[in-house]
């Protein structure tokens, strides 16, 4: 019941996705052969949200992996959990998109998209009552942004009434890996505004800052960054997978967070984040979690919520705690920081409580906020876009793939 189909595309998406499955397998007690080796029946009760039970009691993730070059997927396959995925669900091309949105969306990606859709259809037919799709991708490259948005729009056509949730890694302001990021990101955002229901906005720079300042890691790797992302991804869906006092699902989330259909870009945060050395000095209490969760340093994208106002927010707590205390803390936050909330939506914080905490923690919380300050991200990308587009720099790479200048 209520299955979620996970799709990962491009190098970034596949690396985040691989990490995410490590976390989910750990939570449900599934080892790297797909066999269950956990210790509580709660782990199995709703395991079918993310897993399909195959013959011989193996659990197979409902995941579709796609890329336009085989490299990253080979490393996923040879990674710790590479053997649990269904081999037919690896769909890859040979040519690569070369950081070019047009290649991913129009030429190379369009050739591969039908085989991806076949796999998606197969997985969807295996579901009892499909709730929606979650897509991991980045917006700076070619495959994740171009082919990712193409896939999202195709799925939208075929399953118009299912939720579409994306975890999108935006180009960061200071750290840039490609010159044409602003083009790719702008073209993608245009698609996401139309075709996605909920976008969790992530950003490498903000994640680096969290690793650096909060977790006190001297040299954070992409693995550490992806671990943060996967903690959040797991938190968003914990209510579907474990019993709780106040449940939420993707649709409830959307209904409570989106005041106007185009404003569906959210900032996410996760608590408790503590460096390995200072863990034993912190008390895990609801007020403590709440405080860290609303902290601007805790946001996983480079926009400062203090520069805007929250339209709505959602807090998901995990672990054994009193719902009364959660409600008190939420009211408390809204009263103390009332200037940061819009006054035309009263009680705009939704909270939910799930009884089972993540592995290794007593309690944890995930934060999702719909804040007006997210415009900083869009403004930054669009300024970089305008600067290049004014000179028509790099455009020939896109027009050469059959795009028209008017599309920009």
Curated annotation (Swiss-Prot):
One of its GO terms (molecular function) is structural constituent of cytoskeleton. The keyword Metal-binding applies. It comes from the Eukaryota. Induction: Decreased in the hypocotyl zone of cell elongation by water deficit. SMART domains: Tubulin (SM00864), Tubulin_C (SM00865). Mg(2+) binds at residue 69. InterPro entries: Beta-tubulin_BS (IPR013838), Beta_tubulin (IPR002453), Tub_FtsZ_C (IPR008280), Tubulin (IPR000217), Tubulin/FtsZ-like_C (IPR037103), Tubulin/FtsZ_2-layer-sand-dom (IPR018316), Tubulin/FtsZ_GTPase_sf (IPR036525), Tubulin_C (IPR023123). One of its GO terms (biological process) is microtubule cytoskeleton organization. One of its GO terms (cellular component) is cytoplasm. It is found in: Cytoplasm, Cytoskeleton. Keywords: Cytoplasm, Cytoskeleton, GTP-binding, Magnesium, Metal-binding, Microtubule, Nucleotide-binding. Coiled coil: none annotated. GTP binds at residues 11, 69, 138, 142-144, 204, 226. This is Tubulin beta chain. It comes from Glycine max (Soybean). The lineage of its organism: Eukaryota, Viridiplantae, Streptophyta, Embryophyta, Tracheophyta.
């Amino acid at each position: 019941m209520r299955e979620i189909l996970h799709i990962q595309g491009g190098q970034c998406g596949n690396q985040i996705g691989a990490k995410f499955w490590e976390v989910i397998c750990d939570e449900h007690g599934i080892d790297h052969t797909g066999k269950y080796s956990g210790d509580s029946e709660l782990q199995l009760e709703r395991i079918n949200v993310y897993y399909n039970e195959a013959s011989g009691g193996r659990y197979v993730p409902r995941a579709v992996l796609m890329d336009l070059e085989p490299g990253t997927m080979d490393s996923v396959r040879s990674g710790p959990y590479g053997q649990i995925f269904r081999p037919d669900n690896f769909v890859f091309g040979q040519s690569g998109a070369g950081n070019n949105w047009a290649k991913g969306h129009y030429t190379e990606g369009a050739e591969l998209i039908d085989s991806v859709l076949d796999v998606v259809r197969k997985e969807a037919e295996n579901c009892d009552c499909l709730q929606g799709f979650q897509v991991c991708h980045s917006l700076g490259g070619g495959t994740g942004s171009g082919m990712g948005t193409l896939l999202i729009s195709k799925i939208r056509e075929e399953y118009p009434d299912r939720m579409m949730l994306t975890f999108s890694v935006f180009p960061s302001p200071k750290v840039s890996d490609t010159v044409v990021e602003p083009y790719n990101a702008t073209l993608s955002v245009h698609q996401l505004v139309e075709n996605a229901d909920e976008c969790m906005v992530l950003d490498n720079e903000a994640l680096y800052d969290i690793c650096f300042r909060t977790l006190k890691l001297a040299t954070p790797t992409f693995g550490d960054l992806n671990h943060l992302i996967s903690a959040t991804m797991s938190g968003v869906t914990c209510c579907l997978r474990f019993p709780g006092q106040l449940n939420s699902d993707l649709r409830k989330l959307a209904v409570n967070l989106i005041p106007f259909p185009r404003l569906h870009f959210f900032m996410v945060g996760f608590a408790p984040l503590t460096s390995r050395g200072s863990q034993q000095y912190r008390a895990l209490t609801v007020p403590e979690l709440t405080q860290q969760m609303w902290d601007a340093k805790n946001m996983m994208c480079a926009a400062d919520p203090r520069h805007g106002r929250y339209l709505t927010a959602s807090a998901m707590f995990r672990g054994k705690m009193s719902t009364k205390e959660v409600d008190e803390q939420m009211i408390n936050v809204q009263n103390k920081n009332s200037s940061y909330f819009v006054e035309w939506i009263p009680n705009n914080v939704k909270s939910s409580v799930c009884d089972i905490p993540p592995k290794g923690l007593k309690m944890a919380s995930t934060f999702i906020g719909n804040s007006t300050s997210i415009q900083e991200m869009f403004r930054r990308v669009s300024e970089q876009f305008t600067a290049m587009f004014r000179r028509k720099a790099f455009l020939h790479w896109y027009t050469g793939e059959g795009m028209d200048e008017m599309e920009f």
